[in-house]
Structures are given as structure tokens and as C-alpha cells.
UniProtKB/Swiss-Prot annotation:
Family under the similarity heading: Belongs to the TRAFAC class TrmE-Era-EngA-EngB-Septin-like GTPase superfamily. EngB GTPase family.
InterPro entries linked to this entry: G_ENGB_dom (IPR030393), GTP-bd (IPR006073), GTP-bd_ribosome_bio_YsxC (IPR019987), P-loop_NTPase (IPR027417)
Positions contributing to GTP binding: 39-46, 65-69, 83-86, 150-153, 183-185
Gene Ontology cellular-component annotations: cytosol
Function: Necessary for normal cell division and for the maintenance of normal septation.
Cofactors (names): Mg(2+)
Species of the source: Shewanella halifaxensis (strain HAW-EB4)
UniProt entry keywords in alphabetical sequence: Cell cycle, Cell division, GTP-binding, Magnesium, Metal-binding, Nucleotide-binding, Septation
Keyword Nucleotide-binding found: yes
Binding site for Mg(2+): S46, T67
UniProt-recorded name of the protein: Probable GTP-binding protein EngB
Molecular function terms, GO-annotated: GTP binding; metal ion binding
Amino acid sequence: MSESRIDFRKAEFLISAPDIAHLNEYLPGDVGVEIAFAGRSNAGKSSALNLLTEQKIARTSKTPGRTQLINVFKLDKHRRLVDLPGYGFAQVPLALKLKWQQALGEYLLKRDCLSGVVVLMDIRHPLKDLDMQMIEWAVESHIPVLALLTKADKLGQSDRMKMVNEVRKKLSNFDDAVKVEPFSSLKGIGKSKVLSILDGWCKPEWLMQQIEADAIAAAQAEAGKE
């Protein structure tokens, strides 16, 4: 069964939750497909979500660490985007910082419907310890990762590709589990490439088969009414 490209502009706010335990209370079970966005508090995560959905769906802040909640956005009845709390911020109490990092780890390791994780990193300062931890958690759970090097407009074309290649080399031990792409919310660099990757993550074979089966069942039920 074929399906047209997912329209990420249709994303709409669903719920907010302080941690994965509360998230499970609100979501309709661990079902469907979720794509998570994670990154350091200054990596430009909210700006990236706003560009990809072409709306101000995620709140941006000049204060690192302000986004403390897990925010969930619905694409359709089968698919969701999940904006995870920023990590690595300095002006936050250690206990709260550790609590958030634990919640991120639990989400990545326990959420079966996760179809992909976008780890956003400032292209000028990639692969910090917590970035690597996020990537390793996802790979450990057999979840594909897109390492998105944000603020790519801050570098010239030559330096930009040099950094992309360096990061790809450092992550090469993960084989095909991790893709690396440059991105700029300001200039739109990498937008179409990212949307293509996300579109693929939204269409795992099992979900496409389920959608087809549901369509057939609905058609048969409708025919039975005639």
C-alpha cells in the first residue's frame, strides 16, 4: 500500500507531561508511531520543530532549560511528534537536571512505539557527552537516529561539510543506525532532507499493513450496509 507524503504542517498540540510515567497516562497506549526530538537546551530544537511544521508549534526561549515538559504533537491518529526536554543546561539545580535526564533515558529505552529519534546539536559544538548518551540509548533500543547539526548557517559551505564529515566519521561505528545531516532553521538548510527521513520513519511496514487492513475492513463494512 502506498501513501502520500506525511504533511507535517498538520501537527497539532496533544498533551504535555512532566515525565514518561505521566505521558503514559495521557497517550492511547504505547501504540502507533512516535518520533522524538532531543537536544541540548541551546541546540535550536524548538526552532527546528517550528520550521518543519511551518507553524509556531514549539515555544522558543532565550533561557536555556526552560522547556521542562515532554510535549506531544499529533500528526494523525497513528503518528505523533514528541518534543523532549532540553538537556545539558547550566542554570538548573543538579537534582532537577538528573531527574530530566532519567526521564529521557526511560523514554528512549521503554517506549516501544518510537520509530526514530532526532538528536539536535549545534554544528559548532557537536557530540557532547549527553549527546552521545542519547544516541547510544536509542541505538541500544534499535531505534534509528538522525544527528541533526543545527545552526549550519553559522559556518561557510566548506567548514560546514568538513564538520558534517567529521561527525559522520565519529559515529561510523553505529553503521546505518545513525544518519548525520546539516540543518538551519534560519536559512532552511536541510529541511527537505529531514522531512524525507521523518516521512520514512512514519511509515514502518507494520503500520502500513495495519492502515491497509483497516481501510479494507471499513470498505467491507460500508458495502454490507448497502
